[in-house]
Amino acid sequence: YLADYITKWVLGINPSSILEPSCGDGRFIQALFNNNSEKEKNITCFELIDSEADKSKYLLKSLGFNNFSVYSSDFLRWSVDNFKADQIEFEGIIGNPPFIRYQYLNEEFQESAKNVFDLLNFKFTKHTNSWVSFLISSLSFL
Protein backbone atom coordinates (compact mmCIF):
# COMPACT_ATOMS: atom_id res chain seq x y z
CA TYR A 1 0.00 0.00 0.00
CA LEU A 2 2.81 2.44 0.80
CA ALA A 3 4.40 2.01 -2.62
CA ASP A 4 1.12 2.65 -4.45
CA TYR A 5 0.25 5.63 -2.23
CA ILE A 6 3.61 7.37 -2.63
CA THR A 7 3.84 6.59 -6.34
CA LYS A 8 0.33 7.86 -7.05
CA TRP A 9 1.15 11.07 -5.16
CA VAL A 10 4.39 11.61 -7.12
CA LEU A 11 2.74 10.80 -10.46
CA GLY A 12 0.17 13.50 -9.64
CA ILE A 13 2.75 16.15 -10.58
CA ASN A 14 3.47 14.33 -13.86
CA PRO A 15 7.26 14.18 -13.51
CA SER A 16 9.29 13.41 -16.61
CA SER A 17 12.14 11.96 -14.51
CA ILE A 18 11.94 9.83 -11.38
CA LEU A 19 14.60 8.75 -8.89
CA GLU A 20 14.33 5.52 -6.87
CA PRO A 21 17.44 5.55 -4.63
CA SER A 22 16.94 2.11 -3.04
CA CYS A 23 14.89 0.04 -5.47
CA GLY A 24 15.37 -3.45 -4.07
CA ASP A 25 13.44 -5.95 -6.17
CA GLY A 26 11.16 -3.28 -7.63
CA ARG A 27 8.11 -2.77 -5.42
CA PHE A 28 7.93 0.92 -6.38
CA ILE A 29 8.56 0.07 -10.03
CA GLN A 30 5.53 -2.20 -9.91
CA ALA A 31 3.63 0.67 -8.30
CA LEU A 32 4.52 2.91 -11.26
CA PHE A 33 2.91 0.35 -13.54
CA ASN A 34 -0.08 -0.14 -11.20
CA ASN A 35 -0.70 3.61 -11.28
CA ASN A 36 -0.54 3.86 -15.08
CA SER A 37 2.76 5.68 -15.33
CA GLU A 38 3.79 6.70 -18.82
CA LYS A 39 6.35 4.22 -20.10
CA GLU A 40 8.59 6.98 -21.49
CA LYS A 41 9.41 8.53 -18.10
CA ASN A 42 13.12 8.66 -17.33
CA ILE A 43 13.53 6.33 -14.33
CA THR A 44 16.82 6.10 -12.45
CA CYS A 45 17.21 3.42 -9.79
CA PHE A 46 19.96 2.40 -7.38
CA GLU A 47 20.39 -0.86 -5.48
CA LEU A 48 23.39 -2.25 -3.60
CA ILE A 49 22.58 -5.92 -4.04
CA ASP A 50 23.29 -7.09 -7.60
CA SER A 51 20.60 -9.78 -7.65
CA GLU A 52 17.94 -7.30 -6.49
CA ALA A 53 19.08 -4.72 -9.06
CA ASP A 54 18.78 -7.41 -11.73
CA LYS A 55 15.20 -8.11 -10.61
CA SER A 56 14.37 -4.42 -10.96
CA LYS A 57 15.91 -4.26 -14.44
CA TYR A 58 13.92 -7.31 -15.51
CA LEU A 59 10.73 -5.87 -14.03
CA LEU A 60 11.15 -2.53 -15.79
CA LYS A 61 11.68 -4.32 -19.12
CA SER A 62 8.80 -6.74 -18.63
CA LEU A 63 6.40 -3.93 -17.70
CA GLY A 64 7.27 -2.05 -20.88
CA PHE A 65 9.29 0.84 -19.47
CA ASN A 66 11.84 1.91 -22.05
CA ASN A 67 13.80 4.82 -20.58
CA PHE A 68 15.48 3.60 -17.42
CA SER A 69 18.80 3.01 -15.71
CA VAL A 70 19.37 0.67 -12.78
CA TYR A 71 22.70 1.08 -11.06
CA SER A 72 24.01 -1.69 -8.86
CA SER A 73 25.81 0.72 -6.58
CA ASP A 74 25.62 2.87 -3.47
CA PHE A 75 23.25 5.80 -3.98
CA LEU A 76 24.82 7.83 -1.18
CA ARG A 77 28.28 7.55 -2.69
CA TRP A 78 26.85 8.44 -6.12
CA SER A 79 25.07 11.46 -4.67
CA VAL A 80 28.27 12.69 -2.97
CA ASP A 81 30.17 12.27 -6.25
CA ASN A 82 27.46 14.07 -8.26
CA PHE A 83 26.24 16.68 -5.79
CA LYS A 84 27.54 19.66 -7.75
CA ALA A 85 26.66 18.29 -11.18
CA ASP A 86 24.11 20.84 -12.36
CA GLN A 87 22.85 18.65 -15.18
CA ILE A 88 21.56 15.93 -12.82
CA GLU A 89 18.04 16.68 -11.68
CA PHE A 90 14.89 14.66 -11.08
CA GLU A 91 11.30 15.86 -10.98
CA GLY A 92 10.04 13.12 -8.65
CA ILE A 93 11.34 10.70 -6.05
CA ILE A 94 9.80 7.38 -5.04
CA GLY A 95 10.99 4.71 -2.66
CA ASN A 96 11.32 3.55 0.89
CA PRO A 97 14.86 4.20 2.11
CA PRO A 98 16.66 1.77 4.38
CA PHE A 99 16.11 2.27 8.10
CA ILE A 100 19.45 1.35 9.62
CA ARG A 101 21.03 2.99 12.65
CA TYR A 102 24.35 4.68 11.94
CA GLN A 103 26.35 2.42 14.25
CA TYR A 104 25.14 -0.65 12.32
CA LEU A 105 26.32 0.68 8.96
CA ASN A 106 29.70 -0.47 7.73
CA GLU A 107 32.46 2.13 7.76
CA GLU A 108 32.13 2.96 4.06
CA PHE A 109 28.41 3.77 4.41
CA GLN A 110 29.02 5.72 7.61
CA GLU A 111 31.45 7.89 5.68
CA SER A 112 29.00 8.40 2.80
CA ALA A 113 26.19 9.31 5.21
CA LYS A 114 28.37 11.88 6.94
CA ASN A 115 29.59 13.28 3.61
CA VAL A 116 26.00 13.91 2.50
CA PHE A 117 25.39 16.00 5.61
CA ASP A 118 28.67 17.86 5.17
CA LEU A 119 27.99 18.70 1.51
CA LEU A 120 24.52 19.98 2.33
CA ASN A 121 25.73 21.92 5.39
CA PHE A 122 23.56 19.98 7.83
CA LYS A 123 24.57 19.08 11.35
CA PHE A 124 25.48 15.40 11.58
CA THR A 125 25.43 13.16 14.63
CA LYS A 126 26.15 9.48 14.97
CA HIS A 127 22.55 9.01 16.09
CA THR A 128 21.31 9.71 12.58
CA ASN A 129 19.50 6.87 10.84
CA SER A 130 20.40 5.95 7.25
CA TRP A 131 17.00 7.02 5.91
CA VAL A 132 17.80 10.65 6.73
CA SER A 133 20.86 10.64 4.46
CA PHE A 134 18.81 9.06 1.68
CA LEU A 135 16.03 11.61 2.07
CA ILE A 136 18.14 14.76 2.12
CA SER A 137 20.41 13.47 -0.60
CA SER A 138 17.45 12.63 -2.85
CA LEU A 139 15.86 16.01 -2.23
CA SER A 140 19.06 17.75 -3.27
CA PHE A 141 18.52 16.43 -6.81
CA LEU A 142 15.01 17.88 -7.23
What are these regions (language model features)?
Residues 1-142:
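SAM-dependent methyltransferase catalytic region
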